[in-house]
Amino acid sequence: MDTFNVREYLKKDSFDIDEYLMMIGWAELLSREEEQALVEKAQQGDEEAMNLLLWSKARFVINLANQYTNKGKGVSLQQLLNVAMPVLQKAVLEYDVHNEDPLIKYAVPQMREALEKI
């Protein structure tokens, strides 16, 4: 299966969350070594590597965003994902691959901060 382009999909005016969940379900979990290699490539401008990283972390981002859907602000899951995914992308670019913590642990506080501002 071709790589699912998470960023392009989220740019749509609206999307079918069930279709989105199905597509991200195809993403393989990455080993620490695979993640580090993709981060290094993404930091060098490799768009495919960036997309693979975002795709592999999309399930986690959905779980995180879902924590903010019932805050009484009337914000849709799509809006929350449109906030969280660019933050994850920025975290990929800033992440130190020599850090002992996984990428997602580095990115979560930044995503939470952005989601809390909505």
Segment roles from a protein language model:
Residues D2-I118:
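Alpha-helical promoter-recognition and RNA polymerase-docking modules of transcription initiation factors
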